[in-house]
């Protein structure tokens, strides 16, 4: 959620910044509702002050018959106050709803562009594998090795699900443990295991609601949502809390399954693990001082990159343009890993700074010192990494001519010393 005072004082600037996201994002209704809201509030408070003052005068008079006119006048004032307050409630409800639908303002360092074609390559790492054979897609490799079973998963549940087994299941578990150990031991994150279902307030706090409800799996009676990412429960750990400056930065890492309806993705990545309704992910979440948020984003991105470097998977870092960043983000780096069968890079992690956008929605604040007024923290998060897509990258980049898969050196201790997956 954006700062109302900032928008009010910088309306043209805010509208211009939002325009770089693309689409028609007008703040005209914001201006109208804000003016109505302030006018009604002023009128109500003025009458309340008058009523309090006159009521004190009336209370001092022993013979109430001498102030009948004032008593009658105050009854009329009370009725007007109720009318103003009722109107104010309606206006504020619409105003608050509108605020929840306005996306974050892109950070000044975010490249301006309309779509992913205008994203900027920041850096690349690693050499692309040279193969003396036609590389197979990961689904063919996995089915030949009998480590992923898409057909039975479809029978069990439906499309866009996968059954991992044998070395495939072990490799997925190894990746989760490897990532969590790296982030908690070497990068200093605190490991947490949050609930996989959250309430509406949690989804609203991180920005998934109200705008993206159609993308979520919703349970009823009681109402809960299956999490689309660990970002949601982990960010909400400190919802409605005031932190100490000395506590910052707070860094969490969490493994969770993630659940997404993938609305609007019909026909995209219909085979394999790239786009699933359920997938595993290790997440990185930070709560930081506003002065440190950009530096902390660089650190967090580097921590996600380290996973790919240790697995020796070639990748590149992309700075997303203003038209491609997410609703809540002000700046985002995507990590894209090389997939030989597609002869291209595919996203494996998004690392974002949200400024105080999520903190305002979730009420996450801190104090510079005991006497200071609470301020909003800045939040950041990123995938460290998407486990299924990492498995895809390993299968494709480490495939051999005979269809076997070499296990990356860094994963072998987690695989019981297994060096190769064979038939």
From Swiss-Prot:
Q: Does the keyword Aminoacyl-tRNA synthetase apply?
A: yes
List the EC numbers from the record. Answer: 6.1.1.11
Which cell locations does it reside in?
Cytoplasm
Where it mainly occurs, coarsely classed, is cytoplasm
One Pfam family named in its UniProt record: tRNA-synt_2b
Biochemical pathway: Aminoacyl-tRNA biosynthesis; selenocysteinyl-tRNA(Sec) biosynthesis; L-seryl-tRNA(Sec) from L-serine and tRNA(Sec): step 1/1
Give me the reactions it catalyses: tRNA(Ser) + L-serine + ATP = L-seryl-tRNA(Ser) + AMP + diphosphate + H(+); tRNA(Sec) + L-serine + ATP = L-seryl-tRNA(Sec) + AMP + diphosphate + H(+)
Gene Ontology CC: one annotated term: cytoplasm
User: Where is L-serine annotated to bind?
Assistant: 229-231, 283, 383
The GO annotation for biological process reads: selenocysteine biosynthetic process; seryl-tRNA aminoacylation
Q: Where does ATP bind?
A: 260-262, 347-350
**Which terms are listed as keywords in the entry?**
Aminoacyl-tRNA synthetase, ATP-binding, Cytoplasm, Ligase, Nucleotide-binding, Protein biosynthesis
GO terms for molecular function, please? ATP binding; serine-tRNA ligase activity
| Cited function | Catalyzes the attachment of serine to tRNA(Ser). Is also able to aminoacylate tRNA(Sec) with serine, to form the misacylated tRNA L-seryl-tRNA(Sec), which will be further converted into selenocysteinyl-tRNA(Sec).
Domain text? Consists of two distinct domains, a catalytic core and a N-terminal extension that is involved in tRNA binding.
Protein family (similarity comment): Belongs to the class-II aminoacyl-tRNA synthetase family. Type-1 seryl-tRNA synthetase subfamily.
The record's section on NCBIfam families has: serS
- Subunit (UniProt): Homodimer. The tRNA molecule binds across the dimer.
Q: What protein name is recorded for this chain?
A: Serine--tRNA ligase
Q: Which organism is the protein's source? A: Trichlorobacter lovleyi (strain ATCC BAA-1151 / DSM 17278 / SZ)
Q: Which gene encodes it?
A: serS
């Amino acid at each position: 959620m954006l700062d109302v005072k900032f928008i009010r004082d910088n309306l043209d600037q805010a509208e211009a910044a939002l325009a770089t996201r693309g689409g028609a994002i007008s703040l005209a209704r914001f201006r109208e509702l804000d003016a109505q809201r302030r006018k009604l509030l002023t009128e109500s408070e003025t009458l309340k002050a008058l009523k309090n003052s006159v009521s004190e005068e009336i209370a001092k008079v022993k013979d109430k018959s001498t102030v009948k006119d004032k008593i009658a006048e105050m009854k009329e004032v009370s009725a007007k106050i109720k009318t103003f307050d009722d109107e104010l409630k309606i206006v504020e409800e619409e105003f608050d709803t509108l605020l929840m639908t306005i996306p974050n303002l892109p950070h000044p360092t975010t490249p301006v562009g309309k779509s992913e074609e205008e994203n900027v390559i920041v850096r690349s790492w690693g050499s692309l594998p040279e193969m003396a054979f036609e590389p197979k897609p990961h689904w063919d490799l996995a089915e030949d090795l009998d480590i992923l079973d898409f057909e039975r998963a479809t029978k069990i549940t439906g499309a866009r699900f996968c059954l991992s087994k044998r070395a495939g299941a072990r490799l997925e578990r190894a990746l989760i443990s490897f990532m969590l150990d790296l982030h908690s031991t070497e990068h200093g994150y605190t490991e947490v295991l949050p609930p996989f279902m959250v309430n509406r307030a949690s989804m609203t706090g991180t920005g998934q609601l109200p705008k993206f409800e159609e993308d979520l799996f919703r349970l009823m009676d009681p109402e809960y949502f299956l999490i689309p990412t660990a970002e949601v429960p982990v960010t909400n750990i400190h919802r409605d809390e005031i932190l100490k400056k000395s506590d910052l930065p707070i860094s969490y890492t969490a493994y969770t399954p993630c659940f997404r309806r993938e609305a609007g993705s019909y026909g995209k990545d219909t085979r394999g693990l790239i786009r699933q309704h359920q997938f595993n992910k290790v997440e990185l979440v930070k709560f930081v001082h506003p002065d440190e948020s950009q530096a902390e984003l660089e650190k967090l991105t580097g921590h996600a990159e380290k996973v790919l470097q240790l697995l020796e998977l070639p990748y590149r870092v992309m700075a997303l343009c203003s038209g491609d960043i997410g609703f809540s983000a002000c700046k985002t780096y995507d990590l894209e890993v090389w997939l030989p069968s597609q002869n291209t890079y595919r996203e494996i992690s998004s690392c974002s700074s949200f400024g105080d956008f999520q903190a305002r929605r979730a009420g996450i604040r801190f104090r510079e010192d005991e006497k200071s007024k609470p301020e909003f923290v800045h939040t950041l998060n990123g995938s460290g990494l998407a486990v299924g897509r990492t498995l895809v990258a390993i299968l494709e980049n480490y495939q051999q001519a005979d269809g076997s898969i070499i296990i990356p050196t860094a994963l072998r201790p987690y695989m019981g010393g297994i060096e190769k997956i064979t038939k």
